[in-house]
Amino acid sequence: MHELSYATSIVNAIMEHITNMEQANKVKKVSKINLEIGELTFINFEQLKFAFEVASEGTLCKDAKLEAEFLKPHIACNNCGYRGELTANDEFEVKCPECGSLSLKISGGKEFNIKNAILESDE
């Protein structure tokens, strides 16, 4: 369950950012965290949310809502030059939709980024 390590990383990154803020003592809670997740990370978002609940216990991130934008990988065919989004078939075979070649360069789809977070303060 690699979702727990991702959840722990989210909490650690947010808490480190808050600690380094000039007015860190005014932050009362984190209400929402927006993520960018590449589809090739194979993260199960429901499991990530559950792991986040566990990892955020006792921190300002407790009860924060996680939202995610899922990013598709792209391919470039070394044979015909096709460029576009990666689509896999039921056999999990990845090939060029134009010429059927397996000689592809895959880019993107492995991202895992905190896009932003909404912090609540006294003010």
Swiss-Prot record:
| Single GO biological process annotation from the record | protein maturation
What residue stretch is flagged as signal peptide?
none
Residues annotated to bind Zn(2+): C77, C80, C96, C99
Q: Which Pfam families match?
A: HypA (PF01155)
- Binding sites annotated in the UniProt record for Ni(2+): H2
Q: Which UniProt keywords apply?
A: Metal-binding, Nickel, Zinc
Q: Which domain of life is it from?
A: Archaea
Please provide, alphabetically and separated by semicolons, the GO molecular function terms listed in this UniProt record: nickel cation binding; zinc ion binding
- Do you know which HAMAP family this protein is assigned to? HypA_HybF (MF_00213)
The similarity comment for this entry is: Belongs to the HypA/HybF family.
Give the protein's biological function. Involved in the maturation of [NiFe] hydrogenases. Required for nickel insertion into the metal center of the hydrogenase.
The name of this protein is: Hydrogenase maturation factor HypA
Name the species this protein comes from: Methanococcus aeolicus (strain ATCC BAA-1280 / DSM 17508 / OCM 812 / Nankai-3)
